[in-house]
Amino acid sequence: MLYLVRMDVNLPHDMPAAQADDIKAREKAYAQQLQHEGKWQQLYRVVGEYANYSIFDVGSHDELHTLLSGLPLFPYMKIHVTPLAKHPSSIR
């Protein structure tokens, strides 16, 4: 199942830099692991924002929820999920 996911990150302004750096490093490692597994298929930065659009390919809504809630930045994110279906005019 394919999903388009927008993630907006809002770290607290008073979060110590070392804590923020640790969370970001763990986030990067987890995101890259999911990409290597083929579950996080595409990742795009939103220009000028601390946000991204991503394409996930997972087996169920529950699996996606588990993956997203496992992100170290999850407590600081606003997430919008859009399930995708193949378009009848697509040649792919």
Curated annotation (Swiss-Prot):
Recorded catalytic activity of this chain's protein: (S)-muconolactone = (4,5-dihydro-5-oxofuran-2-yl)-acetate
Gene that this polypeptide is encoded by: catC
SUPFAM superfamilies: Dimeric alpha+beta barrel
Entry keywords, A to Z: Aromatic hydrocarbons catabolism, Isomerase
The UniProt record lists the keyword Iron: no
Entry keyword annotation includes DNA-binding: no
Catalytic EC class: isomerase
Gene Ontology BP annotations: beta-ketoadipate pathway
Gene Ontology molecular function: muconolactone delta-isomerase activity
Protein's pathway: Aromatic compound metabolism; beta-ketoadipate pathway; 5-oxo-4,5-dihydro-2-furylacetate from catechol: step 3/3
Protein name listed in UniProt: Muconolactone Delta-isomerase
Known EC number: 5.3.3.4
Subunit structure: Homodecamer.
Family note: Belongs to the muconolactone Delta-isomerase family.
